[in-house]
């Protein structure tokens, strides 16, 4: 756990943040907006400020709050310092997988989902399960697709779910629209088994690259992720 956050601002490039806010304003959804992984709440501040106070839809945040010390209180203060009241936000301090099971049991639905949590392929795959609770016509955003675990999970998700179409792809921000409901879950047991099997292999690759960097003074060239 870090002692302090790296930044209180949104951890997106200027172009990514601009595109995210534009799509939120363009759609102007009235249903629940979900953020999975909030860090210090910088992106959350920006998303909430895209709405007037009187027109702001419900916001839900899923995060175990173990990224740095006193994370939840730092998030709340960051929101207040940016003129946004944290009191109306539904903070669910738990892992994404646990929160999904509860939300599914409660038959919740969402208009907008922004995923920027842990970047390991198994965690991203679990986060993408939330697409099951996204309404038809809703938007799902996935950040940091240049990270191998995120990119591989995104590739597989898109291959298996053609009813999700790309609306925008800015830098490492992938914006998808759910065009119809599906009889089958977006993420199957096979998908989760694939991700769980792949995760330790990717960790080994990272470890090996670090050893090579230490030996050679630089990282070896790494190919862009390819679908598995």
Give names to the regions the model predicted.
Residues 3-10, 17-228:
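S-adenosylmethionine/decaboxylated-SAM
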């Amino acid at each position: 756990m870090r002692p302090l956050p790296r930044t209180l601002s949104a951890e997106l490039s200027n172009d990514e943040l601009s595109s995210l806010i534009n799509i939120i304003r363009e759609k102007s959804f009235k249903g629940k907006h979900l953020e999975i992984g909030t860090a210090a709440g910088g992106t959350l501040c920006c998303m909430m400020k895209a709405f007037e106070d009187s027109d702001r839809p419900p916001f839900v945040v899923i995060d175990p709050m173990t990224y740095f010390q006193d994370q939840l209180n730092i998030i709340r203060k960051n929101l207040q310092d940016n003129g946004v009241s944290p009191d109306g936000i539904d903070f669910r301090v738990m892992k994404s997988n646990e929160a999904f099971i509860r939300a599914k049991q409660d038959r919740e639905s969402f208009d907008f989902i922004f995923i920027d949590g842990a970047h390991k392929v198994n965690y991203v795959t679990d986060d993408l399960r939330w697409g099951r609770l996204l309404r038809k016509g809703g938007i799902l955003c996935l950040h940091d697709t240049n990270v191998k675990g995120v990119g591989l999970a995104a590739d597989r998700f898109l291959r298996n779910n053609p009813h999700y179409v790309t609306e925008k792809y800015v830098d490492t921000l992938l914006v998808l629209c759910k065009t119809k409901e599906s009889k089958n879950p977006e993420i199957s047991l096979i998908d989760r088994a694939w991700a769980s099997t792949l995760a330790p292999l990717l960790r080994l690759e990272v470890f090996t690259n670090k050893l090579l960097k230490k030996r050679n003074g630089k990282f070896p060239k790494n190919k862009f992720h390819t679908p598995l």
